[in-house]
Structures are given as structure tokens and as C-alpha cells.
Amino acid sequence: MSEADQALVGPKADEPSPPAEEKDEGGGKEAAADAAPGPSASFRLMVTRREPAVKLQYAVSGLEPLSWSEDHRVSVSTARSVAVLELICDVHNPGQDLVIHRTSVPAPLNSCLLKVGSKTEVAECKEKFASSKDPTISQTFMLDRMFNPEGKALPPMRGFKYTSWSPMGCDANGRCLLAALTMDNRLTVQVNLNRLQWVQLVDLTEIYGDRLYETSYRLSKNEAPEGNLGDFAEFQRRHSMQTPVRMEWSSICTTQQVKHNNECRDVSSVLLAVLFENGNIAVWQFQLPFVGKESISSCNTIESGISSPSVLFWWEYEHNNRKMSGLIVGSAFGPVKILPVNLKAVKGYFTLRQPVVLWKEMDKLPVHSIKCVPLYHPYQKCSCSLVVAARGSYVFWCLLLISKAGLNVHNSHVTGLHSLPIVSITADKQNGTVYTCSSDGKVRQLIPIFTDVALKFEHQLIKLSDVFGSVRTHGIAVSPCGAYLAIITTEGMMNGLHPVNKNYQVQFVTLKTFEEAAAQLLESSVQNLFKQVDLIDLVRWKILKDKHIPQFLHEALEKKIESSGVTYFWRFKLFLLRILYQSMQKSPSEALWKPTHEDSKILLVDSPGMGDGEDEQQEEGTSKQGTKAGLQEKSKEGDTEETPEDSLTAGGDTGGREPVEEKLLEIQGKIEAVEMHLTREHMKRVLGEVYLHTWITENTSIPTRGLCNFLMSDEDYDDRTAQVLIGHISKKMNKQTFPERCSLCKEILPFTDRKQAVCSNGHIWLRCFLTYQSCQSLIYRRCLLHDSIARHPVPEDPDWIKRLLQSPCPFCDSPVF
């Protein structure tokens, strides 16, 4: 591996340690240092470049142009669209590069005009302000693009200012929503349901403007009556109170909804906080799944009292099953504080009694970005929250924990990290590691280490010039499980000169080793492969390179399967076997559609009457030479295939050497065995749902009798749980079979195959892998990795069948589209 592709990062031996500066809430010094002199050997980080680098069509825009969602999609704000890069761990692709699915959210063609009054009144006021003889009014009005988004002689304000991903489970497919803020202050919520096209669900700027117009631009009835729009101060006030600065999603919360029969049911909802230019915060509440304007439950406005707000983030704290939430707001003048958010009718949530000031000094250091990470304090034996914020070239941190004495606040700054202002900050939610970057291509890793009093940071320097060459950085984002770091780069200075043209690229580097990723997958509490795509992609890359599964991973996984038997470990084993199978495949040297040189010559020799004898002899000689060359090539390929056999043997295969074809057949047999085990486990789950939700003999859409017969058809399958469950269901069905019938010929569809149903007339229907009903329609859904298909829910389906149809793929945990 070349030096450009891999670099050991960490401060040099002669690099001075950054000075530490720590203050508590009252401004006094604390004893704990916040930055250690340098990283210990256990914290040294090895970063490796991953291909491909994704080129962007347009220049990036906005302050934080890069964001990584929980469902492994990277959004990049550009001057014409939001580029969305989805990381896919494709088990059917033998290539070692990252598999990235690319889509985009285009910017609206028309400019956004904030609603500050009736159209006639607004037009008259604009004409009045533009022709005013007072230069403080006319010039302010003409130069402010908030008042003139069209630009007149200036180019229109296109592009995106900021994007924010919702948590998983918010759209109809159980994935993330994208909130996008354009440069002309239009805030929309976008969804991607078919993986090819993004659709706008709602325009929140328009809805909020209509609400303000209906209330005469007053937030409460106690406020003074609205002023005259012809007054320039009132004109500015109405614009600033609906100009978004930032927006952030909360985690999914549960609310109580009362039915008509006075029964209560739990309804999932999510909150979107929008920070406006005047300091107000609008908190939108959406019912899930979010499908459009009808999913909006409420919108409440909070007055923060912060002048020149610049950024916000959700603070969510959980301790002893009690949850507290608030909004962390930062100012361009320096202060940072938490505002209480009263979540009415939200189960298990409590609110702060009053705002909590995290930093009160008006030191003119603008708060650029805020992140909040939940952690566990090993000394205090309780949960805590780590808040980090970029302020100039410094990192402000604050540790919040609740004890018997109340809310404890420890805060300080980490200095000496960058010589230029920090342009982007991101945090790993798994362990609290913070990454910062400046525009000179330097990235810092800050690892929090708890002390008796508060905490300190081990920090390391990642020089991107050692990995990519001379580059400038514009944003970073860490993957959900901390395996990758995405970086927006352009060319740096060459020979002391800036590049003529800027080519914006999204680069990826690894932050974890294969051993760390494998250990995290084995000990994961999530137990969902799709939610850990970045980790399993590292494992995929390792197996494709080495062409064998490491012995330690194989043994550890077998122990997990024997001890727990959880289907997550079976799915992990299936994933490893599939990647191993792909690593053993021969990569075609030529395109499959091209005819080979050897075949064309043989056809010419065998066909009679094609030229004279000399030509035939020449062609025959040529064909023999081609055949000989082909045999030589095959022998060379056979020689190259010895390497994977050796590596497989080293990976724990104690027997003699076997041909690659036999090894592939052996792996294929193991894959089919694991798939059959996962199929039976899911069949048991489906039968359990049938037993719980049917009281009498009922003909559901699920082929219950066929599932029972299929499970008991294998004599080697001895599962006591399945036998007891089938016995109870058989008693409930009372000798009824309710067979499926073909929609074309009305013949019975026997349940003899888990993948398809074939009637006596030869009509073939694919089976839904979630309910095992035959999909007798032209349209159906498919999982992300094309492992299985599923039918669409219909209105007559009961709720429990609809819940089954919302399940992920039983083989790869991927969502179904």
C-alpha cells in the first residue's frame, strides 16, 4: 500500500501540545485538563483511502454541506441540488470498491418569496423602499437578498444552505426523511420512496407564513397589534421572524392518542425544530409515517431571547428511564444555552424548568456548529451528555449530568487544534469521538476520557495531504457506526499556486480496522445488519481482498450461534458466506457479450465452401494457435487460482487442496442451509402471529396450512417450538385447509417451494417472503439487495398483517421497496 493511500496519524514528536483552558459555568478554573499532551499508543489511528472518489457536478454551498444519515446516505449541499450518495454493501458485487447509489434533490426553479402581507401591499412597499430618498432604507433594501431573492440584475439565489436527516423509521419504508433549506429560505421535507426520485412532501416555509398571516404576525394574543407594513422596521421584522437559519430533527417519541371508544393507543411522532433569524424556534410535530401535510400534528413557537442565533441542536437526556429534552442554541456573539421544550402528551418525557446557560460570555466568537453525544460516566455511574461546539479555531465542550444535587455543568475549551477556523465538526455517537477539520486539509480526532472531576481529550492530527495529496477541505461527516469518514475536498496549492479550476469531490477514509469492525458486529446491541452497513462493508472489503474468512471471526460467530441462536448471527453468517462465494468467483477478462476469437475461427473451419484449401489451412492453423493460446491462458488462470485455495486452507480448512469449483459448491451448500434456517425461523414468526390474532377458524391471506406442512415435511427438522405451535394452530383450524388458488385458472397452488408457487397448469407465481402468500400481481416490492420480494399491503389486510409487511428482509435486514 502506497504512502498516499495509507497514513499513520498522530502528532509529531516535536509538535507542541495545545494549551488547556477550562472554566466552569461561573468562569472559575477547574483542575482537570481538557487536552492531553498527545495520544497514547492505544489511540493511534490508521486511516486508509477507499475508492471511488465521487465527483460533484457543482460547487458546494452552505456552512455545513455534508451530512450522514442513520440509513447510510450522505447528503451534499451544492449550488444546484443536493447530491445524495447511498452506501450499499452489495453481496452480489465481487468488486472491492465502495458501492454507491447516487441520486439528487434538485433546487426549485422559482424563487421563494416570504409572505409578509397581501401581494398588493407588499408590491407597494417594495416600490416605496426601493425609491426612498433615505439611503439607509433604499440601500439596505436593495442589497438584502432576503428581500430580493430574484436578484434583478444579480443572479438568482439557487442552491442549498443546509440539510438535516431525520432518524430512521420516519417515511413509509421505515427510512429517513431529508429536511432541505435553500439559499432563498425555502424549507421543505423530501422523501425517496422508490430509490430513484425524490419527492417534496411539504413546504414548511409556505405553511408557516400562512399561519403568521392568519395571526397578524403575532405569536400570542397578549402581544401588541401588528405595525404598519409600510414601516421599514416592521417590514424587516416580518421577514426575520420567518427566515430559517438551521433546522434539526429530534429522536422518535411516542404520544398517546384517544380513539372514539376512549381507548388509548401509542402513536409515533418526530419533532423538527426550526431556528429563525429573530431567535424564535418553531417546533413542528409530525405523525409517523410522515406522508404529507396531513401528518402535521402541531406547530409551537418558542422565543429563545438569543440575538443573532447561528445554530441549534437537540439535547436529549435519559436517566433511570426518565427522559429530558431541550434545544441547544448558539449565537454568533458567543453565548450557548439550552432552552426547555415542553413535550405535551409525550410518554416518559420531562422538561427543564428554566433555560440552562452553557456559555454566557459575549466574546464575539461565533458558534459555527453544535453536536451532542450521550455517554455513560464510569465514575459517577450515570448517563451524561457531551456537548461540543466549534467556535472559531477552538472547540467548546460541556459535560452535563444529573445527580441528586441537580444538573451539573462542566465546560471548557480545547485550544491549539487548528491554525485556521474550524469549518466542520462531526461526532461518533457510539463512543463520543469528535472530529474537526479546517480548510487547510487537517482533521483532528478528539477522544473524550473521563476523569474524577469532568473529562479530558486525547487528540490526534490526521493530515489528509498524506492520503490524498495537497487538498482543501470543505466539510466532514462520520458514518453512523464510526467506520468511515466522508470528506469534501478540492485541489490544494501546487508549487505555491492555487488551482485554476476547483473540482469538488467526496472522498472516503476508514476509521476502524477490520478486527474492530468484526468485534463491534459480534457484540452489537442493534442486531441489524442494515443499520451497520459501514461496519459490514469493512468486513466485505477484507474478505474480498484475502479470499477467506479469518479464523477468529469464524470461531467467534459459531460460538455466538451455539450460545444464543439469535437470527442476527445467522444473517451475519449468511453475509460472510455470500462474500466468500463472490471472492472465489473468476472475474471475466472480457465482456460477456463479445464473441471469442477462438469460436469465430472454428466456425469458419467447420463451414464448407468457404474459400480455397490454403485459406482453410491458414485458418485452421490460426484456430489451433488460438486454441493453444486459450489453453495457456486457462493454465495461467489455474495458477492464479491457487492463491485463494491456499488462503482458504490457511483460514481453517485442514483438508487437502480441492478445485475451486468444488469449493464453490461447498460454499453454495452452506448458503442454502443458512437460508433455509432463516426461512424456517421466519415461518415460525408468521405462524405465531396467525395464532395470536385468529380466534376462530379464519381464512387469512397467509397460507397457514401450507406453512405447517412445509415445516413438518423435513424429517431431519426437529424443533419442539415449531411442533407445539403447529399443534395449536391445527386445533384452531379444525381440519380446514383454505388453499391458495391460481388467479388465472383457479387451480390449487401447493406450498412445496418457499420461493415460488406453481399450479398444475404451469403458472408460476413468486412468493412474498414476509407472509409467504403468492404474489399474483404485476407489481410487488423488493428488498434493497434483491434478496426477497414482498407484496403490497391492501386495505382489507388487518393491522397485524400490515405490520408483517413492514418488516425488513429476513435474510439481509434491508428495507423493502
Curated annotation (Swiss-Prot):
Residues with the N-acetylmethionine modification: M1
Gene3D superfamilies in the cross-refs: YVTN repeat-like/Quinoprotein amine dehydrogenase (2.130.10.10)
Entry GO CC: mitochondrion; nucleoplasm; transcription factor TFIIIC complex
UniProt entry tagged with the keyword Ubl conjugation: yes
An MF annotation (GO) of this entry: histone H3K14 acetyltransferase activity
BP terms from Gene Ontology: transcription initiation at RNA polymerase III promoter
Main location: nucleus
Uppermost EC category: transferase
Record's keyword terms, sorted: Acetylation, Acyltransferase, DNA-binding, Isopeptide bond, Nucleus, Phosphoprotein, Transcription, Transferase, Ubl conjugation
Cellular compartment(s): Nucleus
EC number: 2.3.1.48
Residue location of crosslink Glycyl lysine isopeptide (Lys-Gly) (interchain with G-Cter in SUMO2): K221, K624
Segments for region (Disordered): 1-40, 603-658
PANTHER family referenced in this protein's UniProt entry, alphabetically: GENERAL TRANSCRIPTION FACTOR 3C POLYPEPTIDE 4, GENERAL TRANSCRIPTION FACTOR 3C POLYPEPTIDE 4 FAMILY
Subunit architecture: Part of the TFIIIC subcomplex TFIIIC2, consisting of six subunits, GTF3C1, GTF3C2, GTF3C3, GTF3C4, GTF3C5 and GTF3C6. Interacts with BRF1, GTF3C1, GTF3C2, GTF3C5, GTF3C6, POLR3C and POLR3F.
Family label: Belongs to the TFIIIC subunit 4 family.
Function of the molecule: Essential for RNA polymerase III to make a number of small nuclear and cytoplasmic RNAs, including 5S RNA, tRNA, and adenovirus-associated (VA) RNA of both cellular and viral origin. Has histone acetyltransferase activity (HAT) with unique specificity for free and nucleosomal H3. May cooperate with GTF3C5 in facilitating the recruitment of TFIIIB and RNA polymerase through direct interactions with BRF1, POLR3C and POLR3F. May be localized close to the A box.
Name of protein: General transcription factor 3C polypeptide 4
Species: Mus musculus
Gene coding for it: Gtf3c4
